Design a protein with these regions (language model features):
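N-terminal glycine-rich phosphate-binding loop for ADP-containing cofactors
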Residues: 1-246
Length: 246
């Protein structure tokens, strides 16, 4: 760009008419005037802006991906999908991680995994998340848009329970996990990613990190946001519990 100080990104969330959050994305050379104009624009359309530095997935999507992945990881461990979804709903999340994967498309998740692997190269972590995504993709179970994903759907697109074929590859564990442990896994995996975003300078304001989490993807509203939640828990306990779960 000839005028890099005028270059700025504006990231809306879907569905746009319902989601209140907008991320304003600063480039390395973005000037204060551009930021101010973007803030004014977002406020004029009755949305809530947060300002973050440019980075892969920005802030909100960066934190929600681990939420989805942790839900899928628990499936591969034999934890019943119903327990995972119930744990998330009881925490106040609008959608459980498995339903959210179906809603956003399993095919999209597989594409993101391939693109991220290509970008990260040897540093890309190998775990069972890609395996389950690619397996579902091969089965043609691409999510709600295909009327077949982790959930079954009727001809009108209404969910009709979990797909039992999932247990062919990932049989249920003989032991049922503690609900609190499942909830902590879902919470901590997001909170730690928010901390990393703050440490790396993607997120510049703790308050905006909390607001972005609650408005952007519905992080347990009662908690005040991931960073406030860690503060409530206290550093010693949060650090110890993170080591145990993540």
């Amino acid at each position: 760009s000839k005028y890099p100080e005028n270059y700025i990104g504006i990231h809306f969330f879907s569905p746009v008419e319902k989601m209140l959050l907008v991320e304003i994305i600063k480039g390395e050379k973005t000037g204060n005037r551009a930021v101010a104009k973007a803030l004014d624009f977002v406020r004029q359309i009755k949305k809530t802006p947060i300002v973050v530095n440019d980075s892969r997935f920005f802030y909100a999507n960066r934190c929600i991906i681990p939420y989805l992945n942790e839900g899928l990881r628990m499936i591969t461990e034999g934890i019943p999908p119903s327990i995972i979804e119930s744990a998330a709903k009881q925490l106040g999340f609008p959608l459980g991680p498995i339903q959210l994967v179906d809603e956003t498309s399993i095919e999209l998740g597989a594409k993101i995994a391939r693109a991220t692997r290509a970008a990260m190269g040897k540093s890309y972590p190998n775990d069972q998340i890609d395996e389950i995504l690619f397996w579902m993709e091969d089965k043609g179970r691409l999510g709600r848009k295909a009327n077949a994903g982790f959930f079954n759907y009727n001809e009108n697109g209404k969910r009709e329970g979990f797909w039992t074929g999932l247990q062919e590859k990932y049989p249920l564990s003989k032991t049922t996990p503690n609900l609190t442990e499942v909830q902590h896994r879902l919470m901590f995996i997001q909170a730690l990613e928010a901390v990393r975003a703050l440490e790396e300078g993607v997120l510049m304001d703790i308050r905006e990190g909390d607001v972005g989490a609650v408005l952007g993807w519905g992080f347990a509203p009662w908690s005040g946001g991931p960073l406030s939640w860690l503060d409530i828990l206290g550093t010693p306990y949060a650090a110890e519990r993170s080591q145990e779960l993540c």
